[in-house]
UniProtKB/Swiss-Prot annotation:
Top-level taxon of the source organism: Bacteria
Keywords: Carbohydrate metabolism, Cytoplasm, Hydrolase, Magnesium, Metal-binding
Cofactor annotation: Mg(2+)
SUPFAM superfamilies associated with the record: Carbohydrate phosphatase (SSF56655)
Subunit structure: Homotetramer.
Pfam families linked: FBPase (PF00316), FBPase_C (PF18913)
Catalytic activity: beta-D-fructose 1,6-bisphosphate + H2O = beta-D-fructose 6-phosphate + phosphate
Record has Transmembrane as a keyword: no
Protein name as catalogued: Fructose-1,6-bisphosphatase class 1
Length: 330
């Protein structure tokens, strides 16, 4: 089996980008270690602090954020970083070539119940000149690499550098990420969907109708039965989609009119959309392809519909859109 470093060499990824990806992977090993120690290390539970999103921070949110910041500052290739847990972008090095956006611990509300969590990251090119928030406001099409690390029964890294999606598994003895799936592929059709049904009454009418038709199964207009899955961590739900197909959505809702969207564009939706498209799927807000969005601020939120291409098309048809001719992967 190829190691991560060997794989990057085989794909002719340039040295500086390879170094950065390896730094993120090595840091994820340390995060995996911290997550596995859990209550034994006293890292469970919440703090009294809130992040810029107004969300109460878990202890591990802060710990993992600091681990990634320290590693990226020492790497030498990073110009600046943006994190879910940072109010503003952070300047790292005036000589860095890359910008890194990340969610250090996606699904951290699952920590106290020992369920799935993960790290999501996106790598963008850095431009010359002063580093500001505007430096980061690039469409998802500009991503040079993206991926996530899933901390589950085994620790797995899903990665794309624009050459498909590869899956690596952390070997528990050698502590090396080894290539275990060289070409992840999302089936075009599916009978699984993932959505937070508790928000149903707050969704827009097109999404309410779409889900109602799925629940009708064989007796409804879709003429087939669907199963629902929900992990309450985007990283876990998207991993399932990449592994066996499906559709994952966190749609627009009016539960809080000031916050109609849940997921963050720069460090959740964009990297996941890049992975999904590279695996043959599609990713949309319901009205716009995620990777084509021009960001307006670093913590911008968007609606997300992603997964099996034909099912995403079916969902979009309820929104009055026809994306059937738009390829998910060139």
């Amino acid at each position: 089996m190829q190691t991560l470093a060997q794989h990057l060499t085989s794909q002719a990824v340039n040295d500086s980008l390879s170094q950065l990806i390896l730094t993120l992977a090595d840091t994820s090993k340390a995060i995996s270690h911290a997550v596995r120690h859990g209550a034994l290390a006293g890292v469970l539970g919440a703090t009294e602090q809130e992040n810029v999103q107004g969300e109460t921070q878990k202890k591990l949110d802060i710990i993992t954020n600091d681990m990634l910041k320290d590693a990226l500052k020492a790497d030498g290739t990073v110009r600046g970083l943006a994190s879910e847990e940072e109010d503003h972008v952070v300047e790292v090095s005036t000589n860095g070539q890359y910008l890194v956006c990340f969610d250090p611990l996606d699904g951290s509300s699952n920590i106290d119940i020992n369920s799935l969590v993960g790290t999501i990251f996106s790598i963008l090119p850095a431009s010359a000149g002063e580093l500001t928030e505007t430096s980061f406001l690039q469409s998802g099409r500009n991503q040079l690499a993206a991926g996530y690390v899933l901390y589950g029964p085994s620790t797995m890294l899903a990665l794309t550098t624009g050459q498909g999606v590869q899956l690596f598994t952390l070997h528990p003895e050698t502590n090396e990420f080894l290539l275990t799936n060289a070409a992840m592929s999302i089936s075009a059709d599916t009978q699984e969907f993932a959505i937070n049904m508790s928000n149903q009454r707050f969704w827009e009418a097109p999404m309410q109708t779409y889900i109602a038709d799925l629940l009708l199964g064989k007796i409804g207009p879709r003429e087939k039965s669907f199963n629902m899955r929900w992990i309450a961590a985007m990283v876990g739900d998207v991993h399932r989609v990449l592994s066996r197909g499906g559709i994952f959505t966190y749609p627009t809702d009016n539960k809080d009119p000031k916050k109609p969207y849940k997921l963050r564009l720069m460090y959740e939706a964009n990297p996941m959309a890049f992975l999904v498209e590279q695996a043959g799927g599609k990713a949309s807000t319901g009205y716009e392809t995620i990777l084509d969005i021009q960001p307006t601020h670093i913590h911008q939120r968007v609606a997300v519909i992603l997964g099996s291409a034909n099912e995403v098309d079916a969902c979009l048809s309820y929104h009055g859109l026809d994306y059937s001719e738009e390829p998910g992967l060139d």
